[in-house]
Amino acid sequence: MTFKHYDVVRAASPSDLADALAQKIREGWQPYGGPFSSYTDDGAALIQAIVAEGDVSTPVVVKPTGGEGAVISATSDPGYYFVVVLAGQSNGMSYGEGLPLPETYDRPDPRIKQLARRSTVTPGGVACKYNDIIPADHCLHDVQDMSRLNHPKADLSKGQYGTVGQGLHIAKKLLPFIPANAGILLVPCCRGGSAFTTGADGTYSDASGASENSTRWGVDKPLYKDLIGRTKAALKKNPKNVLFAVVWMQGEFDFGGTPANHAAQFGALVDKFRADLADMAGQCVGGSAGGVPWICGDTTYFWKQKNESTYQTVYGSYKNKTEKNIHFVPFMTDENGVNVPTNKPEEDPDIPGIGYYGSKWRDSSATWTSQDRASHFSSWARRGIISDRLATAILRHA
């Protein structure tokens, strides 16, 4: 049996789940496995995977230009894109160590694309060139290539390669709020271990972007040239494309540099980015580069516990900048005050019922992302609370 579509149904109670599943079955879906419990910003939730062999008629509510919401098919091909740039360091990219689930929870969507960087769409897959528009999946084409760091339990024949990021899931949560004929184009520009006040500059080429050994942010440095170059390339793909937001998650490696200089250098980078986009203002949300929000995500509890004062110096500098259209999104805890899960093995357990294996299987430097396991958010956090809060912030401020 070959399945063509994968999705999930979420509900707050068994009766709500039954009603939602009944509707999905009428649309051509069928349950896949059994339901399990999870936790979101709204509290406990029941989640059921669903699959379909043929075409489905899943309706979604989209935001029209005026009037009531309209119900449309979720499988239409995009005619243009809302561009979302992803930049910063490791927690902004695919550093979730739990097993990727591309057939279910990390299933790509035909309306979500990315700008290519690597020579193939997936390892050993279809060839692509730098800045081509290609499908987006769980392990995006960032400056640092995470596609080679496979989970010990991965079945590569199922596409379970690499590590898990939040980019795809941010885009999935934005889709219901954009026009039916539009898609999301992700522009991945993150580099793990990068900082403003320490690190190597690396090199930059118009043909391939920043070199993988580039770990220094700053105005006109290779990582910046990569960021602005790929953003412009995404907009030039179609005059209808709109720059929707920049999602920025960075600061951890400035703990070991000169933290007091971080805020000024970040501010200068944002100013330069907006100035360099002045000639494309008509393709920016709000009609100007300054109208494009910078959504700045928090880090894990590990870094705050490591050095509280340095955490406040670096991450506190993202706060109280709403007048500059820079917005901080907290991730230290969930709505119940519980630490947001990380790659620490006890925070990322196996779920055998859905074929999920957590981070404990990455038990050496050959497979883990860092020996400080709590320094990065887990795969489930990226699928859930991280992407939930980032997508909400984009919709609120764009």
Model-derived regions: residue spans:
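Terminus-proximal functional modules
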Residues: 1-65
